[in-house]
Amino acid sequence: EDFTAIGSCIQKEYVYQIYNSRIRDAFLEHRVCFYPQPLDFARLERAGRAFEGTHDFAAVRSVGTETRTTVRTVHWCRAERDGAMISIAVCADGFLYNMVRAIVGTMVYASYGKIEPEDIPALLATRDRRLTGPTMPPQGLYLNRVWYDGVVGDMMNQA
């Protein structure tokens, strides 16, 4: 009776997909982010792990957005590669506006050496959006899973 789809959610997982190839795939147009420059996947993975844990994520939100708190817990930030397709899954107890796209942009920066993956916690601590990577385009961002507490959540997660 007090259930709301947004308010009752205890955690969510978003997936961001990057097609890392110099040649665009017409079948993926408007469905993924095309990124033609080669990415160092090992650095990308290390950067993702640096976001895990409880942090103040003000440095990876849209400038000018207001929330009660910018502290969130990222349960995992994992990258997988299948040929040219890179999928980045980010699961957290909540998200700020454009947070996933900015996290991925920061991971991409780390992938080609603009920042060091190990410096990401210090960059987050500055709360300065200008020090982290760009907000990636919306193509490629998908809400993948949501978790709810109690009976409703159990039924939803079994689907």
PLM features: what roles do these ranges have?
Residues 1-159:
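Structured-RNA-binding interfaces characteristic of tRNA pseudouridine synthases
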